[in-house]
Amino acid sequence: MSVLNVLESHVILHIIEFLPDHEKIKFMSTCKSLYEFRCHVTYNNFYVYDTINHLDFVNKFKKLIYLSIFNENSKNYDPTIIVKSIKDVIPPNTKCIIFDDDFDEDITEFIPEGIKYVVFGIHFNKPIKKILPNSIIHLILGFSFNQSISDILPCGLIELTLGHNFRQSINDIPNTITKLIFDSEFIPEIHGKIPTNINCLGIRGYFGKNHKKDIPNNIKHLIIGTDYHSKMCEVIEDSIDMIITENMTHITLGWNFDDTTFNIPNGVTHLILYQKFNPTIIKCLPSSVEHVEFISRW
């Protein structure tokens, strides 16, 4: 007997909502009856608006990227027509804004209330005081950003990434943040300054001589050197063991750990290893490890 004959439509729809977008499509493509659900499920990945705007269920896509091409060489170009704010031209259902890498302009009144994800590009380095709505939950400050973040971060912010050139104080991080990533070659003094609500800490640039006392006990997921090709292993005193605490359950280890040996503590359940990682440096894996993931090639 078909599952469609056993379960009510709303039950099937509820089950589908638990699947990632690509699995939803696969599942609904198995038969004509299920395919009819495509107009009723929610799609949570990022999609370019121009690729899906022909569909009748555009409102089911929650994260749309709007792209526009402006030709300054156009014969119809009028240099006196200047858009002073894009707040009023951003569609009301927009949840994410990604700034181009070349963008480095004042963004006063750029970001409307309701935006949840904001990503600044490589060259952006303008003050952002009083311009970030409290609806933002995920903020990435790009490579060049080096402005004060004191008293300017949204009160509902959950994830914060600080870029490569960041050299400012982190004393005023909102207590709502649970994930903090340093992409910088400069790591500020973090001892006693990481809020207790943060459970994921990423140090993906120059690590410096940090110790276990600098990593609060509330950190469950530690990310080290994932994206930035640094020389962090040359400055870590004695061993990685010095900064891995017993409370951690998830550890992500990036590049340049070839010459370091360390133990994975008991209690770690997830281990992610990136390329250029020498697997022989791990002395042993505790029985608590349930998931090991190898990213890219060895």
UniProtKB/Swiss-Prot annotation:
Protein name listed in UniProt: Putative F-box and FNIP repeat-containing protein R286
FNIP repeats: 124-165, 255-297
Coiled coil, from the record: none
InterPro entries recorded: FNIP (IPR008615), STK_FNIP-Repeat (IPR051251)
Keyword Repeat belongs to the record: yes
Disulfide-bonded cysteines: none
Assigned keywords, A-Z: Repeat
Domain F-box: 4-48
